[in-house]
Structure formats: C-alpha cells, structure tokens
Amino acid sequence: MIMKKILFITTILWLAVKMPAQDALPVLVSDTIASDTIAPRLQWPENVTVRLDSLMNEPLLKKTQLGLLIYDLTADSAIYKQGERQTLRPASTMKLVTAITAIDKLGGGYQFRTSLYYSGLIERNILRGNLYCVGGMDPRFNNDDMRAFAESVLKMGIDTICGRLIADTSMKDDTRLGEGWCWDDDNPSLTPLLIGKKDMFMERFRQELNDLGIVVMDNEEAIAGNKTKNRPLIHLCSRFHSLDQVLMRMLKESDNLYAESVLYQIAASGGVKNASATHARQWINKLVTRIGLNPGDYKFADGSGLSLYNYVSAELLVSLLRFAYHNQNVYGQLYPALPVAGVDGTLEKRMKGAFTNGNVRAKTGTLTGISSLAGYCTAANGHQLAFAIINQGVLRNASGRTFQDKVCTALCEP
C-alpha cells in the first residue's frame, strides 16, 4: 500500500516536470496619472509611440515649453508624457476646470435664475412701490425673457409705477473684471444682471415697460446693489436657463462671459451672498484634492482662462478629464458640449482628416503666446483616450495648433 502511494506521487511529479508550462498571464499594474513611470506592461501600438517621439523633435519645441499627457482611459494607464507636471498658462482650457467643477458641484439639471419682484400696493392700476430685478448672472437672458418680465407687470393690471426700478446685484461682489485680466482685452462685464451679454439690463427693462404703455414715474437711475433680503416682496416672474445650455456655448464657442457666469454659480452655491471668485476657488480646490492632486501646486484666477495668473498642468487637465469619464453624471454633460474636430465650435476648421474628423472632442485655448488643446479621442485600437497639450511661449499660435493637430492625428491613425 505504501509503495503504491509512493509510485502515484512520483508519477504526478514527473508529469508536472514534463508538461510544457503555460505562458503566464500579464499582471495588470494599477497605474495612476500621478505615477512617475508609464505602466511597463501596457500593450500599445509601437507605431503610435514612434510618431509621438518624432513629434518631440519638432523645431517648435526647441524654443518653447510643452506640457503633454496622453492617457488611455480604457486601460486606465498613461501612455505618453512630456513635461506633464510643468505649470503653464492654460488659456481657454481653463474652461474645462470650470465646467467639470460646476457639473460635479451643481448637477446637470442646475438652472440660472433671474427674478422680478415688487413691493408696496397696487391701487387702481397704480403700483405704489418698487420693482426689483434680482440678478442671477444668466448669460442667456434675452429679449424674450425681458418681454416676459414686462408682461408680468402688465398682467397685474399695472399701468403706472409710482416708485423705482431697482437692480438687486447682491448675488456676487462688485468686481466687474477678473483677476489678472489685461486692460486692453475685450473683456466681458461681470454683472449679475445681463441682457444680450451686455450691462444694460435696467435701461432695457424700462424701455420694455414703456413699449407696453407702463409709465415709471421715478426717472432716476436704478440703484445697483440693493439687497432684497428682509424686504416684504411679492414675486412676479422668474426666467430660467439650464446649465447644459450654458455649457454648450461656453465650451463649443469658448465664450468667456458664459464661463465666468458658471464660475459665479459655483461661488454662490449654498446660498452665499456677494459671492466672489475666491468662493469658487474653494470648490475647485476641493475637487482637485479629490482626484489626488495638490491644489497648492496650481493657481486658479478666473473661470474663462483670460487671466494671465492661471497656472495648471497637463497632468491636472487630464486628471479632471479622467474623473469626468468615470463619472457618468459629469461625462454625460461635458462630452456633448465639447467642440468636435471638423464639425463645430472652435474645432470646426481643424483636423478634417479621415481619422480625426468627428473623432476628436476637445477644448481649445488661445492667448498671446499660449496655445492649448485638451479633451478626448478614440484611438485606432478602439481605446478611449484623454489628452492635454499646452504650448507656451509660441510666437505664432498657428504653429501650436499645427503641432496639436499632428499629435491628435498620431493618436487616431492606424
């Protein structure tokens, strides 16, 4: 009996030695954007790496700074990087920071609100009191909205106002320009009461009332900054526009006023009055911390990227794009709002090649000396990629755009 057991064990050991060993399955090493090395086991088409290596020898890069990171979202691993941690000015790719923070903080269903109230009494078609326009910094407030305001007064039977038209701009602080904006730029006015993107809300409201035959007896200029809090006011009308509507123009057309309006929605969230850019930065910093980076390594000055005080890195932009990709609530709002190469927005005339056209979705950025691009694309192997490219110190922005287009082509071509 003992001999049989010995013979059985010997046979098993002999078979184990003689049988060919199976190839070991690759071990997937968890790779994060913040890691110092690209995952060595990631299988990626060699020709793509060769193309990118070749682009690193472009004459443009000999005299300028580059921040570049390409990340495979499908494999969750970085595949190429160059100066990805350098802090550079993002230009309008700063709008990605603003947009992703806003969607995460406010939710895609968030709505911008502008409201009309009155005080006093209505006697025989005469309002003995004031009308209060309460601003919510809605950049989409338009002529139809203004007409609705005036018609709501008419529907109350009012044809005469023995009082004032008062602008309540207490939603935000009284700054009208962003930190670090150049005085000679065509800068938007940061007022909570907007009409057609212009700071002439109260004049237009008075004219709209007049067109409907409603007389305002007090011809003094509206008093800006009055707060309606603790006043016995009666609601007349509110007009709304959704965050996704605002994001669509903000990102596709790179609208600076829309971006600043979104920044102040973040700042005012939670009922903060006299909201400032500082309030918004607190929420941006919290998100940066959540994605595993140190907010102290960056500078966030405004929401649009107009400021010369903004400093981010390609790593930060890609980290936020990765966060959005893995958060369907954020990605579902962000992705459709990005410009599409060869199709619309600021990418309409770029990357019309067979493999990039309709494939690359990314935010562009342009300031004097700065050209940037950050977003998503699908590689020839079917993998979803996130990328960020910041060219700083370029004398001609067209050269930066050409370089970025070449990078995207290298990623998308077979």
Listing of model-derived features with the role each one plays in the protein:
Residues 132, 148, 171-214, 238, ...:
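A conserved catalytic-loop motif detector
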Residues 22-74, 80-87, 151-157, 413:
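Beta-lactamase-like hydrolase cores
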Residues 1-32, 37:
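Bacterial Sec-dependent N-terminal signal peptides
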Residues 111-172, 181-188, 195:
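Active-site-adjacent, His/Asp/Glu-enriched structural segments that form or flank metal-binding
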Residues 76, 90-108, 165, 204-205, ...:
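Active-site SXXK
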Residues 199-335:
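A small/polar active-site loop signature that marks catalytic segments
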Residues 299-414:
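C-terminal soluble interaction/assembly domains
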Residues 34-43, 81-90, 131-140, 150, ...:
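Second-shell loop/turn segments in exported
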